[in-house]
């Protein structure tokens, strides 16, 4: 009997070595390290990674999170069908703006597939190899999107176990890949037919299975804080929104540039203190403060080398601002 349970995954190393363009310091009188926000602000700019149980819809889970924390707004990223379990990140309040960025990295699942006729491990591995890379996929009949043919990338297909006609495998794939349809297509390629028996998501963007908590854990943590003033558990189960943006390359700006960006300005070369290696033109980048706070996201108009060598010009076209205006003092002048 093959069961889908929690698996151990490697810890993500989110410490990136940045290139210094200009040595500057930050003023600790305003702003703060995202992990040291007041608990009320952590909730306002936070993410709860729920271990979704079998049964409820993803929308129901988001609603429960909103009710538990007494919030006005909460939203999930990457819908899971009611019968599917696993990693479901739920953004809280202001952090809901970051959800579109969660779909950039691939997702990972562990799937139990049932073959309608037996097949050898050798044949299964051969077909897995054929399905690794870019594949054509038409969404299933019950999908909430138009059933047009789409291209999706399968990064990895790994056979974990086989017990008769039951096949347990891990798949790392592009966001928007239908695993149910993948099982059917694999069965067709094997000549056996197949269907998805069980599915568990183990990773969604930067959020891993090790980050996931049960809804009861969230409720208990909230009660501990409200009734006893104990923040420890709530800080454990709520991640700052920056945690879900670690996959993006960074452009770190000076304190003097932050409020201008919050008011809609683009990122100019003169306002940059540090940046990631290997930024390419047109790439989506995260604009951060020197304390590690997410200010905005935008498209890079220059690559890393060009930003380092430039003395003026727009480096990042800002597309979405996350930080509230007034978090940092205004240090810019209006044009007359």
Curated annotation (Swiss-Prot):
The active site is at residue 81. It catalyses: uridine(55) in tRNA = pseudouridine(55) in tRNA. Its EC number is 5.4.99.25. Pfam families: DKCLD, PUA, TruB_C_2, TruB_N. GO terms for molecular function: pseudouridine synthase activity; RNA binding; tRNA pseudouridine(55) synthase activity. One of its GO terms (biological process) is box H/ACA sno(s)RNA 3'-end processing. Gene3D superfamilies: Pseudouridine synthase (3.30.2350.10), PUA domain (2.30.130.10). Keywords: Isomerase, tRNA processing. Residues 248-323 form the PUA domain. Belongs to the pseudouridine synthase TruB family. Type 2 subfamily. Could be responsible for synthesis of pseudouridine from uracil-55 in the psi GC loop of transfer RNAs. This is Probable tRNA pseudouridine synthase B. It comes from Methanocaldococcus jannaschii (strain ATCC 43067 / DSM 2661 / JAL-1 / JCM 10045 / NBRC 100440) (Methanococcus jannaschii).
